[in-house]
Amino acid sequence: MKIGIFDSGVGGLTILKELIRKNKYHEYIYIGDTKNLTYGNSTIENLKKYSDTIINYFIKKRCDLVIIACGTISSNLSNYLKEKHKIKIIDIITPTIDYIVNKNYKNIGLIATNMTIQSNKIASSLTKHNINVITNPAPKLVDLIEKNLMNKKENIKILKEYLAPFQNKNLDLLILGCTHYPIIKKQISSLIKTQLYDMAYPISSLIEDGAILKVQLYFTKLNNDILKNVINILNCKYKIEELKL
């Protein structure tokens, strides 16, 4: 099976990493739209344009399935994209909601991009099931992660401020509502003693096992920070190129 995966940058690689870890060996085409970072601080119209262009590319490449490995796109445009494009599309928000509802959690935290929080998709879906949801946006994190700057003292301070609303709230779970955030899971865990939820967890259950792994990575703007991030995230053979869309 040929699977297209896309995100605004390297964050979606956390989804790909989990799929490979669970032996979902397929042909993967990954697009990180780094030219248009960050999606979480963009507009709906721009996000539609970026997503449509990428999905049309996947269709041109004869992909069988597309995974939206971006919380911002999944929470704001998943219905639009599924209705518009004649290809199977999986978003990462729906499986997250289903997982949490089935676990009977009662008190959840959500840290995500501005646009994911503003969409209210996760919070409204969970509150319908009598789950209390505390939300807080973290608008600077994606850019800092992309630039490999999250080990600097001043940026750990920013992260600490983003996590402050979740402290001492007796949370069952803190949702990492952006696929970039698992990249800094170690730093987050050092600042808050709450179980962390990675949106990659339930995706693998939606994909059948495969036998042959092939990974092609494309970034719409390629630089050394991206190359470093890819090396740190993925533990498999891959080809990587810059892609003009």
Show where each model-derived region lies.
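Non-catalytic structural scaffold of enzyme domains
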Residues: 1-245
